[in-house]
From Swiss-Prot:
InterPro entries: ArgE/DapE_CS, Bact_exopeptidase_dim_dom, Peptidase_M20, Peptidase_M20_dimer, Peptidase_M20B. Cleaves the N-terminal amino acid of tripeptides. It is an enzyme of class 3 (hydrolase). It comes from Geobacillus kaustophilus (strain HTA426). PROSITE patterns: ARGE_DAPE_CPG2_1, ARGE_DAPE_CPG2_2. GO terms for molecular function: metallopeptidase activity; tripeptide aminopeptidase activity; zinc ion binding. It comes from the Bacteria. This is Peptidase T.
Length: 411
């Protein structure tokens, strides 16, 4: 299983599937089509049934039931795209057998080193087979590891028909990294009662709480006049924008928050005297606090509009997704089964909130409750990303164990 996982993962990682937030197509990039078509062929090759790819690049397939029990249909999902923030072109994975616990030279020419001094969690991986970058790209373990693990688990079950299971659906989705993963996902066609995304981080992660999320876009209009004759005439939109930012609580930012704490995050600030644009994301686990954060932004905008003129400030707030806990709590047994599966395999479950979102955040509100399982990677979205092949094996084993438990608990 380990060698199969390594080979699958490296094959997927070499396809550039960065998503593009500025694209209006689905998938947003051609590389995702390339990977999707590859996955369709591989699903057929291992013996999966009902293998489909739709006009938006969503890949689905079925592992038919081999039991007479009335087992709920469960699904497993992973996303094909990688993050747009760091290049995913020409990914060249490096394989390190039996990691010795020391520095890993990713790129000798550029002096790029993956060191336990900077990333102390490396100490947990001594003796593991690691897959790293060559220091010039991201790796794409988020979430090509999840794809490889689902594929390998399905292949294992097909090769071991003595393991009884209900009907299982799998899906590989585009554009998760730009928040559009489920936008065109056909929940009815997928036909699962519950699902799991395999999109988490280190060994044991099990997540069913996500942020409530919104984005805010502020446009401020100024008045540009020659600075030599500007007294009483110029209105500098940059300074108004700075005033807006300064009225938000400075300590409620990503760099100062953790756990269940929410934040405001200024993503971009682009401006001139004449016009300035601010782009924020707003995050909070608590729905009331989430609404209060949005209200705070509206209050600041209204105050500045009163001070500088109503026509000078526009604020647009759009909700992006909500905390999936609200939809998963009524079917909490799906979390409990994942917890039991990990425990059965000697893995300590680490139940914690996702300081972010997954496809499951949106799917849960589309009628498909979907908690998140670990995929095994570390340091996602950058040159220091790596993954343990040993923990990829455990992720695939957890998928198999969850499927077995659903069958065993059915009548």
């Amino acid at each position: 299983m380990k060698q199969e996982l390594i080979e699958r993962f490296i094959r997927y990682a070499k396809v550039n599937t960065q998503s593009d937030p500025n694209s209006h197509t689905c998938p947003s990039t051609s590389g995702q089509w390339e990977l999707a078509r590859m996955l369709v062929e591989e699903l057929k090759a291992i013996g999966m049934e009902d293998v489909t790819i739709d006009d938006n690049g969503y890949v689905m397939a079925t592992l038919p039931a081999n039991t007479d029990k009335n087992v709920p249909v469960i699904g497993f999902l992973a996303h094909m795209d990688t993050a747009p923030e760091f290049t995913g072109a020409n990914v060249n994975p490096q394989l390190i057998d039996s990691y010795d616990g020391g520095d890993i030279v990713l790129n000798k020419e550029q002096g790029i080193i993956l060191s336990p001094n900077d990333f102390p969690e490396l100490a947990h991986y001594k003796g593991h087979t690691l897959i790293t970058t060559d220091g010039t790209t991201l790796l794409g373990a988020d979430d090509k590891a999840g794809i490889a693990e689902i594929m390998t688990a399905m292949n294992y079950l097909i090769q071991h028909p003595e393991i009884k299971h209900g009907k299982v659906r799998v899906a590989f989705t585009p554009d998760e990294e730009i928040g559009r993963g489920p936008h065109k996902f056909d929940v009815a066609k997928f036909g699962a009662q519950f699902a799991y995304t395999v999109d988490g981080g280190p060994l044991g992660e099990l997540e069913y709480e996500s942020f409530n999320a919104a984005e805010a876009k502020i446009t401020i209009k100024g008045k540009n006049v020659h600075p030599g004759t500007a007294k009483g005439k110029m209105i500098n939109s940059i300074k108004i924008a700075m005033e807006f930012e300064q009225q938000l609580p400075a300590h409620e930012a990503p760099e100062h928050t953790e756990g269940y704490e929410g934040f405001y995050h200024l993503l971009s600030f682009q401006g001139s005297v004449e016009e300035t644009k601010l782009h924020y994301i707003i995050r909070d686990f608590d729905r009331e606090q989430f609404e209060a954060r949005k209200a705070k932004m509206k209050e600041i905008a209204a105050s500045l509009a009163q001070k500088y003129g109503n026509d000078r400030i526009t604020l647009e707030i759009n909700d992006q997704y909500y905390n999936m806990r609200e939809k998963i709590e009524p079917v909490r047994h799906i979390v409990d089964i994942a917890h039991e599966a990990m425990t059965n395999l000697g893995i300590e479950p680490k139940v914690k909130p996702i300081r972010g979102g997954t496809d499951g955040s949106q799917l849960s509100y589309m009628g498909l409750p979907t908690p998140n399982l670990f995929a095994g990677g570390e340091n996602f979205h950058g040159r220091y990303e790596y993954i343990s092949a040993d923990n990829m094996v455990k992720a695939a084993e957890v998928i198999v164990e969850i499927i077995k438990l659903f069958e065993q608990k059915a009548s």
